[in-house]
């Protein structure tokens, strides 16, 4: 089954603000985990475990390091996705960015009427403009518009 690039592009646009919020949240969580893991309250790295096993504190420390690494990877992936969408949007003109924003990123009720009024066109023309903006964004984002 071939990939529908325009659907992928639309999904990227719809998720854009949520991904930006996730980046902020992940950055906060990473800072908190770093301070907990490597701060003054972290277990001593040279502590000798009792009765030959790993200490409970050491186990928590290892788990915190693992969680920190997973959060950092999630942040890197999310950041790449956000930057790719922003590069795709930057390749468009202001009108196309506004249309995509109104349809997919920050959609509000009455967006088609508002765009038709702003650009002095019929609502059917707004949908045509949206389709062209999606094609251009898809091309800028993925290098292909249709396959």
Positions of PLM-derived features:
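N-terminal positioning helix adjacent to the helix-turn-helix/winged-helix DNA-binding module
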Residues: 81, 92-96, 129
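N-terminal interaction/assembly modules
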Residues: 1-91, 114, 139-147
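Helix-turn-helix DNA-binding module
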Residues: 107-125
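Short amphipathic alpha helix immediately N-terminal
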Residues: 92-110
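DNA-recognition helix of helix-turn-helix
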Residues: 120-140
């Amino acid at each position: 089954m071939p990939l529908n690039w325009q659907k992928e592009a639309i999904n990227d646009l719809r998720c854009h603000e949520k991904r930006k919020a996730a980046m902020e949240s992940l950055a906060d969580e990473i800072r908190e985990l770093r301070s907990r893991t490597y701060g003054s309250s972290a277990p001593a790295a040279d502590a000798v475990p009792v009765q030959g096993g790993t200490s409970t504190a050491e186990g928590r420390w290892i788990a915190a390091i693992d969680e920190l690494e997973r959060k950092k990877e999630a942040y890197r992936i999310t950041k790449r996705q956000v930057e790719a969408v922003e590069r795709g949007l930057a390749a468009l003109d202001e009108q196309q960015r506004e249309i995509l924003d109104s349809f997919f990123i920050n959609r509000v009720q009455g967006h088609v009427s508002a765009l038709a009024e702003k650009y002095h066109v019929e609502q059917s023309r707004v949908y045509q403009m949206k389709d062209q903006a999606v094609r251009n964004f898809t091309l800028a984002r993925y290098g292909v518009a249709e396959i």
